[in-house]
Amino acid sequence: SGVSGDERRVGLLIASFIKPHCDKLFFDRTGNLIAFKKGRSTPKSPVMFCAHLDEVGFMIRHINDDGSLLFEQAGMMPEVLLSKRVLIGENKIPGVICSKPVHLTRGKEKEPPQTDNMYIDIGAQNAKQAKNLDVYAKYAAFDNAFTVLGDGTAVCSKAIDDRFGCQVMIRLLSSVPEYDSYFVFTVGEELGGTGALAAVRYIKPGIAVILESTTASDLPQNTGGNKVCSVGGGAVVPFMDGGTKYDERLVKRLWDIAEENGIRVQTKSRIA
């Protein structure tokens, strides 16, 4: 696991895979893992490929007298958290996210709870037991099994955002790029993209290609433009996202490359 702020182990694992394929490999002060690979030619400014190491998760901020844990989270909607299993700290202490039982709620309490009204139950009977498990100020990640769905073309897992992007970059590093390229495995994306900002300032790329997951809403109740994009419909090359308008020439070039190589692509019909 590599929750935002605790990505180092994931970075070290990836570094062990890609080291034989890099001309230069290092961690910057932000925590980004940066790989440089010499291409067939050297442009005025290098190309940068980018995918983030971190996943959504939690940090334990307080231990209650009864041994339950309060937490902070980033990058998630609170209503999806209840009943989720988590693993806390280096010792992977198991816990479950809980709130007041719905059959005991009254009035506004029946509304979806916010994280301030949730806690993690680790089975401790009191604060002393919880402290002995070394969970205070530790990171917590979801405890989900990697599951293959259907005919094997779909999977269910935590951290798909953005370990799939990391895997694509690992594969790219096994070949020689057309141009001198940096491959940046960034930290802090779920906290606002702090790692990516630091990498751009250091590398000063002419072109940056971000390999990310995105929103698909191809559900039975959604039709046409409300689907955003479809799982299995090909790689998504959007024209814009929230806060970002992509260079039209670069978008067109990516679409042309896809057509020339028989690669299925789609765009997003909504900014989501």
Where are the regions that the model predicts?
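N-terminal hydrophobic/helix-forming segments and targeting peptides
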Residues: G2-A272
